[in-house]
Amino acid sequence: MDLSLSTRTVGDRTVVEVGGEIDVYTAPKLREQLVELVNDGSFHLVVDMEGVDFLDSTGLGVLVGGLKRVRAHEGSLRLVCNQERILKIFRITGLTKVFPIHTSVEEAVAATD
Amino acid sequence: MATVELRFSALPEHVRTARLVAAAVARRSGVDEAVLDEVRLAVGEACTRAVGLHQSSGISAPVRVLLIEEEKQFSIEVGDEAPRTAPGEKVPGAYGADDPDAESEEDEMGLAVISGLVDDVEVTAGEHGGLIRMSWPNTPPAALVP
């Protein structure tokens, strides 16, 4: 199992669909993708985590780094996740207060606050 | 006391192997299915931390993982050989040297995840390296059914 990444544009948002395992080995690929998007001027990101089987603190670090980057451009980074095993990691680290977490891509794309 | 020992070169790509082996041995020793996700995550965090410490200290020795089946509990020990003169202090090295603060934050986050996940955890470190020991209750199979 590796990490899969694909991006698409929905209105002014860029949806990054992530699949597989985000860990110390694969997280740099996600970091590169997020950095590249921000460098190319995409500041409103929706990271769809529905296809993620595993996420560790390295992955959380990359997401926090992404959030920091888009915020520097007054952008946003929203997550889509319904999986309890993944949500639990955000809860125990207190990151549910940092990231807006949505139940669907449609909801995340429509969100404005 | 049955033990499985795993040693791997301090490379990020091997952390996944350690997770898979740990989860397989934990399942076999009777750790509840619902807890296996936690075992997988916790051992991954501990190994990630050990890999980072070995790389930043330039240590070529492998990271050591012990999977210990006991009567009422299943334990995992993840040992590194990175010397500390004080807890958390690191020797500068190649890995992440351009951004040492970020690395140390990730290290802290890994420990935060472990302590949030595992009730029974001990973290020790000394001049010869560090050790994270984590335990979970288990129910060993009563008998072998062929």
Curated annotation (Swiss-Prot), chain A:
Top-rank taxon, per record: Bacteria
Fill in the PTM field for this protein.
Phosphorylated by RsbW on a serine residue.
Checking Pfam families in the record gives:
STAS
Q: Which residues carry this modification: Phosphoserine?
A: 57
Has keyword Phosphoprotein? yes
Q: Which UniProt keywords apply?
A: Phosphoprotein
Boundaries of every STAS domain copy: 3-112
GO terms of molecular function: anti-sigma factor antagonist activity; identical protein binding
Family note: Belongs to the anti-sigma-factor antagonist family.
Function in brief:
Positive regulator of sigma-B activity. Non-phosphorylated RsbV binds to RsbW, preventing its association with sigma-B. When phosphorylated, releases RsbW, which is then free to complex with and inactivate sigma-B.
NCBIfam families tied to this protein: ant_ant_sig (TIGR00377)
Mind telling me what this protein is named?
Anti-sigma-B factor antagonist
